[in-house]
């Protein structure tokens, strides 16, 4: 599972997830990807579960990029504990995902295999996802000399 090597603070505020993703909204490394359609916290366990679902379907073929990382700790108080008396102990790690963020990318497999692998991965995630392809018309591809 993914988690940071070290952090400056053990506990952080929850924050809010208003707005859309500013970066990471296009397929950059691979050929195909899944894009979040809504905002959510995605735990390191959910990321790992989605990765396993994809790689098993692809039978170790192709390459997978995970473009989200769980930097944010979330806390939980023990069961049957009264309110107050401080914030709970760190329970796990989450990645904050906003709408438009490309979470996983795949290359080296056909489109139908990639579509099915990413569909299986999206079932493991708590957000609605959309299949996206790499756009070849961007950048300096002007061929007029």
UniProtKB/Swiss-Prot annotation:
Query: What Gene Ontology molecular-function terms does this entry list?
Result: rRNA binding; structural constituent of ribosome; tRNA binding
Q: What is this protein called?
A: Large ribosomal subunit protein uL16
Which Gene3D superfamilies does this UniProt record tie to the protein?
A: Ribosomal protein L10e/L16 (3.90.1170.10)
Cited Pfam families: Ribosomal_L16
Question: Which NCBIfam families does the record match to this protein?
Answer: rplP_bact
Q: Which organism is it from?
A: Exiguobacterium sibiricum (strain DSM 17290 / CCUG 55495 / CIP 109462 / JCM 13490 / 255-15)
Q: What does this protein do?
A: Binds 23S rRNA and is also seen to make contacts with the A and possibly P site tRNAs.
Q: Which residues form a coiled coil?
A: none
Protein family membership = Belongs to the universal ribosomal protein uL16 family.
